[in-house]
Amino acid sequence: MSSSKAFVGARIFDGATWHDGEVLVIGNGEVATLSSGAPANAEVISAEGLLIAPGFIDLQVNGGGGVMFNNEPDVDGIARICAAHAKFGTTALMVTLITDRPDITAKAAEAGVAANKTGVPGFLC
């Protein structure tokens, strides 16, 4: 299987300009290029009629998906918050704690370190 993917047929927004008729090539999990055609070695994915745009980055998130970080200051809480926000286009976020007791603040800090070490998708530290 190829390590690069070519998304064809979509209308692509790069954050400043709309690109119609171009191919978005992803390599090693990152945007590699916009081109007029798919590379020969790429897995071609039809995105006909779809829009492709950058995800949102939210730098202050107190909760999501039924989880308030103050109530669940652990890695599972962070993962559930990140997953809930991802469904609506937020691809990266910073979980923030509302002012709380010192023991909750300590648990939240420990959870952030652990989430960073384990690579929770979407978590910024």
Give residue ranges: language-model regions.
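A generic local secondary-structure boundary/capping motif
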Residues: 14, 116-119
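Short, conserved beta-strand segments within well-ordered enzyme catalytic domains
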Residues: 24-25, 33, 58, 68-70, ...
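Divalent metal-dependent hydrolysis catalytic cores, especially in the metallo-beta-lactamase
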Residues: 62-64, 79-108, 121-125
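N-terminal metal-binding scaffold of metallo-dependent hydrolase/deaminase domains
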Residues: 1-39
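Short coil/turn connectors at secondary-structure junctions
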Residues: 2-3, 40-42, 48, 52, ...
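N-terminal hydrophobic targeting/anchoring segments and the immediately downstream early-domain regions
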Residues: 111-115
